[in-house]
UniProtKB/Swiss-Prot annotation:
One of its GO terms (molecular function) is carbon dioxide transmembrane transporter activity. N-glycosylated. The gene is RHCG. Signal peptide: none annotated. GO terms for cellular component: apical plasma membrane; basolateral plasma membrane; cytoplasmic vesicle; plasma membrane. It comes from Pan troglodytes. This is Ammonium transporter Rh type C. Ammonium transporter involved in the maintenance of acid-base homeostasis. Transports ammonium and its related derivative methylammonium across the plasma membrane of epithelial cells likely contributing to renal transepithelial ammonia transport and ammonia metabolism. Postulated to primarily mediate an electroneutral bidirectional transport of NH3 ammonia species according to a mechanism that implies interaction of an NH4(+) ion with acidic residues of the pore entry followed by dissociation of NH4(+) into NH3 and H(+).
């Protein structure tokens, strides 16, 4: 089926409408947190505080790292498609910019409401980035097959569902999920996989040649991998309690990521008959350890435990890219462009299970009495909880997340199937030229619904033949 992909009025109107709504809602509901307000001066004097004690100085370095991961790491990781680099980075930029605004509102209404106002500080910015990271994960499943309008619609609904799921887990079930193995990765992955299943394209084979990478596109994607890999310790520790919890989360993530690289390389080489490495595995499976250690990151997992998690996830993720992704596409009709099930889905579930087991096995000998109370908030509502109770609720949180992702993905997928969102036809998927003005001679797309459009020439422009210069040895020497 061919759809009209001319977005001249639809995209501008959608973007402007959403932004105007954001301006109005921010004007009505959003104010600065007291540490960002000018009244901080009187508060500081009254409580004898120093500017250095402002939350900004504790949290902003982590916020910077998380921000880079969302906009640079995820964006460039998805540039592996040979003709979809503009869209991978550009649409990631678009959905993230809208998503952080909507996330500040949705999370604010659930977590940061004081009176009738949402108070915004640096911690809100980190949480909004976490929410958008989940959207970026889901984007990987539908990459190349949807229009920017569909992505904005998906972002709107996913951020809403993310905030609801996060509230249920963190506020009602009292789950610990510092690095978001459940709330971010599991939810984002299975929401995205459900959406892409609903949007299944029977004739996607017509765009199969564009679904491959080339040398340069893989190199750009590797840049995204390195940014994600380097900053993941900040991601998993960004909102942990100051002091030992945050310190522990960074160490555990660091160790898990390091182990994951070695096992990913080992399995990738072992699965090739000539022992060669597959760049897809190195770009993605090497990050699975950071996903899986997220829930238990601030727990007393021990460095060797983090290494074991990374070791196992490197193996499972690489095997998933080789065997599971083709199976899901051929048997279940799940067209997972980026293989997010192997990088975020399965490692996220592993992370949820590891978090439950680690919480259930917590003891006074390992944590100490005060450390146990502080690490799991065993006070107030949870005053009579035991470690086993915490572990049980961790599992409940994982199950709720999966249910929310699957049900939400079905509903949003059905909305995105409507024919007026400007989605590309099956033969024009994974092609920048559908939505972007391309440099001369860099488009092979054909849009039959636009009679004025003429497909351009070959993707590699012809170069006039030039006689080669003579070799140095053949040039006569002047005596």
């Amino acid at each position: 089926m061919a759809w009209n992909t001319n977005l001249r009025w639809r995209l501008p109107l959608t973007c402007l409408l959403l932004q105007v709504v954001m301006v109005i809602l921010f004007g009505v509901f959003v104010r600065y947190d007291f540490e960002a307000d000018a009244h901080w001066w009187s508060e500081r004097t009254h409580k004898n505080l120093s500017d250095v004690e402002n939350e900004f100085y504790y949290r902003y370095p982590s916020f910077q790292d998380v921000h880079v991961m969302v906009f640079v790491g995820f964006g460039f990781l998805m540039t592996f498609l040979q003709r979809y680099g503009f869209s991978a980075v550009g649409f990631n930029f678009l959905l993230a910019a809208f998503g952080i605004q909507w996330a500040l509102l949705m999370q604010g209404w659930f977590h940061f409401l004081q009176g009738r106002y949402i108070v915004v500080g640096v911690e809100n910015l980190i949480n909004a980035d976490f929410c958008v990271a989940s959207v970026c994960v889901a984007f990987g499943a539908v990459l190349g097959k949807v229009s920017p309008i569909q992505l904005l619609i998906m972002t709107f609904f996913q951020v809403t569902l993310f905030a609801v799921n996060e509230f249920i887990l963190l506020n009602l079930l009292k789950v610990k999920d510092a690095g978001g193995s459940m709330t971010i990765h599991t939810f984002g992955a299975y929401f995205g996989l459900t959406v892409t299943r609903i949007l299944y394209r029977r004739n996607l084979e017509q765009s199969k040649e564009r679904q491959n990478s080339v040398y340069q596109s893989d190199l750009f994607a590797m840049i995204g991998t390195l940014f994600l890999w380097m900053y993941w310790p900040s991601f998993n520790s960004a909102i942990s309690y100051h002091g030992d919890s945050q310190h522990r989360a960074a160490i555990n993530t660091y160790c898990s990521l390091a182990a994951c690289v070695l096992t990913s390389v080992a399995i990738s080489s072992a699965l090739h008959k000539k022992g060669k490495l597959d760049m897809v595995h190195i770009q993605n499976a090497t990050l699975a350890g950071g996903v899986a250690v997220g829930t238990a990151a601030e727990m007393m997992l021990m460095p060797y435990g983090a290494l074991i998690i990374g070791f196992v996830c490197g193996i499972i993720s690489t095997l998933g890219f080789v065997y599971l992704t083709p199976f899901l596409e051929s048997r279940l009709h799940i067209q997972d462009t980026c293989g997010i099930n192997n990088l975020h889905g399965i490692p996220g579930i592993i992370g949820g299970i590891v978090g439950a087991v680690t919480a259930a096995s917590a003891s006074l000998e390992v944590y100490g009495k005060e450390g146990l109370v502080h690490s799991f908030d065993f006070q107030g509502f949870k005053g009579d909880w035991t470690a086993r109770t915490q572990g049980k609720f961790q599992i409940y949180g994982l199950l709720v997340t999966l249910a929310m992702a699957l049900m939400g993905g079905i509903i949003v997928g059905l909305i995105l199937r409507l024919p007026f969102w400007g989605q590309p036809s099956d033969e024009n998927c994974f092609e920048d030229a559908v939505y972007w003005e391309m440099p001369e001679g860099n488009s092979t797309v054909y849009i039959p619904e636009d009679p004025t459009f003429k497909p351009s020439g070959p993707s590699v422009p012809s170069v006039p033949m030039v006689s080669p210069l003579p070799m140095a040895s053949s040039v006569p020497l002047v005596p």
